[in-house]
């Protein structure tokens, strides 16, 4: 069985998920919906991907420049089994009525409230909870990053305190900032902690800052342990955790710039670093407290989760079979 997949919103996340879908033997990319005929729409067409207008209201935009569309989102929904909604935050909830009317399963992204879906999802943490579901939310890039490493040590966790150092904008985003400031999120906790709790039931508090960079987020994590764990134990656990990589400052990984360069050296599409990067030297245990620092490529870490969510929703594979297939297809190192 090949699941027929549509994508609503072919931008930073949508185009990456579209690429990932095209690499799966059990999925077929049927088409993508766009609001305007920008360079991403033209590129999709060049790749042979059918392009639809996200609404009848947007059709004139395409007609004005002679961009031939296949139809509208409603037409696309008639041809797919599942729609991946990669529209800006808040739009997914508005779009849900369309998906329900069409009788199509849907995957939402982390910009939506948890209430939009039946389950919030990170594959290695709660794959089984998405089995057979109609509506699944893949949590945000930051929440995915936190969940991957914390889930690996969840049996040792008493309480987590984490600081999110967030990138200001994606590389192609000219509308967001700041450019010359550090912007704190003065609400405590930031939304990331409660979001982690929608996936794994742990005690966690988070704070967040936005800084003038585009490459990656960085998390400073402190964990109060409820039972003994050594630095060597943590290193071994992370070494054996899928979609988590250890990077060493000693080998030149001084910053997020080198992590992105590493992804470029792997010839990854859009220099995707699907894996969460933990600096090995930062892993430290002092008494009952564990510390570590990790980096999150906000443009790509959620991509494999979308693929695994599709398999779970259609019960195409069990957890580790799906993760293995996704990892292999995308060149994820482990």
UniProtKB/Swiss-Prot annotation:
SMART domains linked to this entry: Gp_dh_N
Active-site residues per Swiss-Prot or TrEMBL entry: 141
EC number(s) given by UniProt: 1.2.1.59
Main location: cytoplasm
Binding sites annotated in the UniProt record for D-glyceraldehyde 3-phosphate: 140-142, 192-193
CDD domains (UniProt xref): GAPDH_II_C, GAPDH_II_N
Database matches in InterPro entries: DapB_N, GlycerAld/Erythrose_P_DH, GlycerAld_3-P_DH_AS, GlycerAld_3-P_DH_cat, GlycerAld_3-P_DH_NAD(P)-bd, Glyceraldehyde-3-P_DH_2_arc, NAD(P)-bd_dom_sf
Cellular compartments per GO CC: cytoplasm
Pfam families cross-referenced by the UniProt entry: DapB_N, Gp_dh_C
Keywords: Cytoplasm, Glycolysis, NAD, NADP, Oxidoreductase
Functional pathway: Carbohydrate degradation; glycolysis; pyruvate from D-glyceraldehyde 3-phosphate: step 1/5
Gene Ontology terms for molecular function: 4-hydroxy-tetrahydrodipicolinate reductase; glyceraldehyde-3-phosphate dehydrogenase (NAD+) (phosphorylating) activity; glyceraldehyde-3-phosphate dehydrogenase (NADP+) (phosphorylating) activity; NAD binding; NADP binding
The keyword Secreted is annotated on this UniProt entry: no
Record Gene3D superfamilies: Dihydrodipicolinate Reductase, domain 2, NAD(P)-binding Rossmann-like Domain
Subcellular location field: Cytoplasm
Keyword Oxidoreductase among UniProt keywords: yes
GO BP terms: glycolytic process; lysine biosynthetic process via diaminopimelate
Chain positions recorded as NAD(+) binding sites: 12-13, 111, 167, 298
Annotated catalysed reactions: D-glyceraldehyde 3-phosphate + phosphate + NADP(+) = (2R)-3-phospho-glyceroyl phosphate + NADPH + H(+); D-glyceraldehyde 3-phosphate + phosphate + NAD(+) = (2R)-3-phospho-glyceroyl phosphate + NADH + H(+)
Signal sequence coordinates: none
Similarity-based family: Belongs to the glyceraldehyde-3-phosphate dehydrogenase family.
NCBIfam families per UniProt: GAPDH-II_archae (TIGR01546), PRK04207.1 (NF003251)
Subunit record text: Homotetramer.
Protein name (database record): Glyceraldehyde-3-phosphate dehydrogenase
Organism: Thermococcus sibiricus (strain DSM 12597 / MM 739)
